[in-house]
């Protein structure tokens, strides 16, 4: 195995500021528009691209609702108007989740959201249209990630409380 010589040194103040600002930028949001008309349909994957749905109809998904089933897939749809105040700005979809969600906006894949990524940049893919139609497919694990905690070992199911989805500018 090759060894890499590590040079230990202090960071210059500029480097430290750049590093910290990069961390802080993740939490600075200029405009935050809630996406209200979200609907969801829960399913269980039977085989590849074959799902058994728990209901034939989509149900509304509101802030504070439980969503996802243990080891389940959810199909989520939403549509929102882009106000004039957000036109010609860099738009992002912001959604906190413990699941893995792939996102389409106006029919184009724009990226994914997961516990490590809570937003997706939209503008390079769809510009700034008058309306944005979202289609999302998410997968939720059947147990928490932290297996060191004896209490979480007995828990089967990572149901989540929906905290809302937002159209934001940064």
Feature-to-residue mapping (PLM):
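Aromatic-lined ligand-binding clefts that engage carbohydrates, nucleic acids, or primary amines
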Residues: 85-105, 114
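Beta-strand-rich ligand-recognition modules
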Residues: 102-150
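Intrinsic-disorder/low-complexity, polar/charged segments enriched in Ser/Thr/Lys/Arg/Asp/Glu/Gln
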Residues: 73-79, 90-92, 131-133
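An acidic-aromatic loop/edge-strand motif
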Residues: 2-27, 31-38, 46, 136-170
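Extended low-complexity, serine/threonine- and proline-enriched intrinsically disordered segments
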Residues: 35-53, 100-107
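Short beta-strands within extracellular/lumenal beta-sheet-rich domains
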Residues: 64-84
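Short Pro/Gly-enriched beta-strand edge/turn motifs at strand-loop
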Residues: 58-64
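Solvent-exposed residues in well-ordered beta-strands and their adjoining turns
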Residues: 81-83, 96, 137-139
């Amino acid at each position: 195995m090759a060894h890499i010589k590590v040079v230990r040194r202090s960071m210059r103040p500029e480097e430290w500021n750049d590093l910290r600002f990069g961390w802080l930028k993740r939490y600075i949001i200029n405009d935050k528009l809630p996406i209200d008309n979200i609907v969801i349909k829960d399913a269980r994957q039977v085989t590849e691209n074959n799902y058994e749905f728990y209901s034939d109809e989509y149900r509304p998904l509101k802030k504070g609702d439980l969503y996802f089933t243990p080891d389940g897939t959810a199909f989520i749809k939403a549509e929102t108007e882009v106000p004039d105040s957000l036109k010609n700005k860099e738009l992002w979809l912001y959604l906190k989740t413990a699941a893995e969600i792939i996102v389409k906006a106006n029919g184009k894949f724009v990226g994914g959201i997961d516990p490590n990524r809570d937003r997706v940049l939209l503008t390079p893919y769809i510009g700034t249209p008058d309306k944005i139609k979202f289609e999302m497919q998410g997968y939720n694990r059947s147990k928490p990630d932290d297996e060191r905690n004896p209490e979480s070992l007995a828990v089967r199911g990572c149901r989540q409380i929906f905290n809302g989805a937002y159209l934001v500018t940064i």
